[in-house]
C-alpha cells in the first residue's frame, strides 16, 4: 500500500502541527502528518485541565517515558525524560509556561555562520504571529495567532506576589513581562491556556484550524519506521500502525520533514542511515550519509526545588486532598475558572549569579504548594516552593539508536553536572534562593525550610543534595543542530546537510539551548521555517527595543542580609 503527498511530516507535536497548518494554507499543497500517539481527547481532564499537568507524566498514554542511561555525575541515576505522545506532542503534556527565551539567546545564534537571520528581531515577528495574548497585542505580543496565552490576574494566590516582592527586595530587578522588553528580574509569568481555562496545545491552536482541510491527512498511532531515499534524496517513509508489523509506505513528492523532537528526530535519522558512520555500521544499518553530528550536542535544563512550610492556610495544599477535587473539577469543567484553570506557575524570574554572565543564567518558577513536578511526594501540609535551574550548562550529551527497531527507545545520555560551572551555578543558586526566601515580603508566610533543610549548608552537603534530587525540566534540545560546522546537521532553514528533500524542524535544531522553557520557541522556529518552505518573504524585522544588561550590577543590596555556610 502506498500513498503520495507533497510533504510528509513525522510528528504532530509543537513544530509538526505548526508546519502542517501553515503548509496546508496553500490549497494546492498536500500534507501527510504522522503521529505515533493517539488523539488529544478533549474530555480527558489529565491533558486539558491546566492544574492537572502532573497526570500525563505518570502514565504511558501521552508520554514516551524515556529514561537516560545511568548519569555518571548524578550517582548513576537513570533520569526521567518524559516526551509528549499524541496530537500536540509535548505541548499536550508540558507545564504550559509561556516563556520565549532571552533576546541574547537568538542574537547569539545569529553570530554563528549561516544563521545570520536568526537574530531576536528576526524571530520576534514569528513569536507574535503564533500568539493571541488575552490582554491584547503590543510590540512584543500577538493578537490573532493560534497559541492562546493567558496572563496572571488580580486576585490570584497571594504567594505569587510575595515571592516576586521577595525577589525585588533581594536586590533584583522587577519586570512586568518576562517575554517583553526585559526578561531579567522577577514578575508575573504567562501561560499557554485558553480564555476558557483549557490547555492551549498546538493540537487545539493549530490543528483545529487545519484538520478539516481536504489537503491535510492526519494518521494517528502511526510509528515511523524509517525515511526512504533514492540516492541522497528523501522520497518517502515507511510506518507501522498500532501493533501491526506490516509497514505502510508513503511517498513525498517534495520533502520529508522530521519533527519528532530532540530524542526521536536523531534516532529516526540514524535508523534511516543518516548519522555517524561508526554507530550505523555497529547496528548493521546501511549508511546513506555519514553525518557525525546527528544525536550529538544534546542539551537540557536541570532544576531542583527549595520547599518551605507555609504558616498561613493560603497554599494549594487543600486541592491535593481527594475530597476537595470534585468541586475544583466541576468549576473548571463548567465555568473554565478556579484553581483548575491555571498551571499555578504564575510568577517567576531570571537572574545572573555572577558578573561574567551577560544575561540570566538561572530561572525560577514559583509554585504555591510543595510537591514534585510529576505529582509525587506532596508535602502533607501548607507549603510553597521555588523551582531553580541553570539555563546554559556547558554539559553536552548524545542520543544513539540501539537497533533498527522503531519501538526500541534510544540510548540517552545528557552528562548532567559534568562541568565545574554546573556545580558552581547550582550552589550559587541554592544560596541566592535562600536569600530571596528570607526577605520581609515572605515573613507572613514562611515557615521552616522543608527541602533541602536548613542543616544543608556546606558545598559538600549542597552537592550531595543536587546529585540526589535535581531533575530534568523536560527541555531536551540541540541534538540535530543548525549551523555550518562539521557537527552541524541542518542549515539555517532546517535542510539536512548533504541531502535533498529532507528537513528537521523542531527543538533539536537549536544550536544552543535558550534561557527558559522551549515550547514557544519551538513553535516560532516552525513558523519561521514554514515561510521558507512556502517560498514566502520573511516577515519584516521588528524594531522593538530590548534590554541588554551591559555593565549593570548582578544585583543590588538585599533588604535583609543572610549569613550562609
Swiss-Prot record:
* Binding residue positions for FAD: 6-35
Which InterPro entries does the UniProt entry name for this protein?
Answer: BetA, FAD/NAD-bd_sf, GMC_OxRdtase, GMC_OxRdtase_N, GMC_OxRtase_C
**GO-annotated cellular components:** membrane
Q: Name one Pfam family in it.
A: GMC_oxred_N
Q: Which GO terms describe its biological process?
A: glycine betaine biosynthetic process from choline
Presence of the UniProt keyword NAD in the record: yes
Q: Report which reactions are catalysed by this protein.
A: choline + A = betaine aldehyde + AH2; betaine aldehyde + NAD(+) + H2O = glycine betaine + NADH + 2 H(+)
Q: Name one GO molecular function term.
A: flavin adenine dinucleotide binding
Cofactor(s), by name = FAD
- In short, the EC number is 1.1.99.1, 1.2.1.8
Q: Where is the active site?
A: 475 (proton acceptor)
Q: Per its UniProt entry, which superkingdom is the organism in?
A: Bacteria
SUPFAM superfamilies reported for this sequence: FAD-linked reductases, C-terminal domain, FAD/NAD(P)-binding domain
Q: What does this protein do?
A: Involved in the biosynthesis of the osmoprotectant glycine betaine. Catalyzes the oxidation of choline to betaine aldehyde and betaine aldehyde to glycine betaine at the same rate.
Similarity-based family: Belongs to the GMC oxidoreductase family.
PANTHER family attached here?
A: CHOLINE DEHYDROGENASE, MITOCHONDRIAL (PTHR11552:SF147), GLUCOSE-METHANOL-CHOLINE GMC OXIDOREDUCTASE (PTHR11552)
What's the protein called, per UniProt? Answer: Oxygen-dependent choline dehydrogenase
Source species, please? Pseudomonas putida (strain ATCC 700007 / DSM 6899 / JCM 31910 / BCRC 17059 / LMG 24140 / F1)
Originating gene: betA
Amino acid at each position: 500500500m502506498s500513498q503520495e503527498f507533497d510533504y510528509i511530516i513525522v510528528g504532530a507535536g509543537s513544530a509538526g502541527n505548526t508546519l502542517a497548518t501553515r503548509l496546508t494554507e496553500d490549497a494546492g499543497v498536500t500534507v501527510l502528518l504522522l503521529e505515533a500517539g493517539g488523539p488529544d481527547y478533549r474530555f480527558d481532564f489529565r491533558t486539558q485541565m491546566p492544574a492537572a499537568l502532573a497526570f500525563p507524566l505518570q502514565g504511558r498514554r501521552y508520554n514516551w517515558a524515556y529514561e537516560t542511561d545511568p548519569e555518571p555525575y548524578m550517582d548513576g541515576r537513570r533520569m526521567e525524560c518524559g516526551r509528549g505522545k499524541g496530537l500536540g506532542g509535548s505541548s499536550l503534556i508540558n507545564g504550559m509556561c509561556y516563556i520565549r527565551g532571552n533576546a541574547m539567546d537568538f542574537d547569539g545564534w545569529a553570530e554563528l555562520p549561516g544563521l545570520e537571520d536568526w537574530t531576536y528581531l528576526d524571530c520576534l515577528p514569528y513569536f507574535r504571529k503564533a500568539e493571541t495574548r488575552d490582554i491584547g497585542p503590543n510590540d512584543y505580543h500577538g493578537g490573532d495567532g493560534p497559541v492562546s496565552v493567558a496572563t496572571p490576574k488580580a486576585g490570584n494566590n497571594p504567594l505569587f506576589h510575595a515571592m516576586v516582592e521577595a525577589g525585588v527586595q533581594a536586590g533584583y530587578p522587577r519586570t512586568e513581562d518576562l517575554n517583553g522588553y526585559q526578561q531579567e528580574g522577577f514578575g508575573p509569568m504567562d501561560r499557554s491556556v485558553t480564555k476558557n481555562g483549557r490547555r492551549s496545545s498546538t493540537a487545539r491552536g493549530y490543528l483545529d484550524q487545519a484538520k478539516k482541510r481536504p489537503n491535510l491527512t492526519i494518521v494517528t498511532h502511526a510509528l515511523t519506521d524509517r525515511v526512504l531515499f533514492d540516492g541522497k534524496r528523501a522520497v518517502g517513509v515507511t510506518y507501522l500502525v498500532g501493533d501491526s508489523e506490516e509497514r505502510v509506505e508513503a511517498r513525498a513528492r517534495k520533502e520529508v520533514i522530521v519533527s519528532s523532537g530532540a530524542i526521536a528526530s536523531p534516532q529516526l535519522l540514524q535508523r534511516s542511515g543518516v548519522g555517524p558512520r561508526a554507530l550505523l555500521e555497529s547496528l548493521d544499518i546501511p549508511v546513506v550519509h555519514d553525518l557525525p553530528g546527528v544525536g550529538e550536542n544534546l542539551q537540557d535544563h536541570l532544576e531542583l526545588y527549595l520547599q518551605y512550610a507555609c504558616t498561613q492556610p493560603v497554599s494549594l495544599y487543600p486541592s491535593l486532598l481527594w475530597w476537595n477535587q470534585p468541586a475544583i473539577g466541576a468549576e473548571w469543567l463548567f465555568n473554565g475558572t478556579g484553581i483548575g484553570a491555571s498551571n499555578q506557575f504564575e510568577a517567576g524570574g531570571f537572574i545572573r549569579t555572577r558578573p561574567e554572565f551577560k544575561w540570566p543564567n538561572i530561572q525560577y518558577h514559583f509554585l504555591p504548594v510543595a510537591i514534585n513536578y510529576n505529582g509525587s511526594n506532596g508535602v502533607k501540609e501548607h507549603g510553597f516552593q521555588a523551582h531553580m535551574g541553570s539555563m546554559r550548562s556547558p554539559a553536552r550529551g548524545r542520543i544513539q539508536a540501539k537497533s533498527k527497531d522503531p519501538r526500541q527507545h534510544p540510548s540517552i545520555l545528557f552528562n548532567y553536572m559534568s562541568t565545574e560551572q554546573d556545580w558552581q551555578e547550582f550552589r550559587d543558586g541554592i544560596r541566592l534562593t535562600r536569600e530571596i526566601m528570607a526577605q520581609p515580603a515572605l515573613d507572613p508566610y514562611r515557615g521552616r525550610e522543608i527541602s533541602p533543610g536548613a542543616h544543608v549548608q556546606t558545598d559538600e552537603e549542597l552537592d550531595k543534595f543536587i546529585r540526589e534530587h535535581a531533575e530534568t525540566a523536560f527541555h531536551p534540545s540541540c541534538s540535530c543542530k543548525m549551523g555550518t560546522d562539521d557537527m552541524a546537521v541542518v542549515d539555517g532553514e532546517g535542510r539536512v546537510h548533504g541531502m535533498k528533500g529532507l528537513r528537521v524542524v523542531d527543538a533539536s535544531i537549536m544550536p544552543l539551548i535558550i534561557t527558559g522553557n522551549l515550547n514557544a520557541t519551538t513553535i516560532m522556529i516552525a513558523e519561521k521555517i514554514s515561510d521558507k518552505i512556502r517560498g514566502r518573504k520573511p516577515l519584516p524585522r521588528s524594531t522593538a527595543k530590548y534590554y541588554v544588561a551591559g555593565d549593570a550590577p548582578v544585583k543590588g543590596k538585599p533588604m535583609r542580609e543572610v549569613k550562609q555556610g
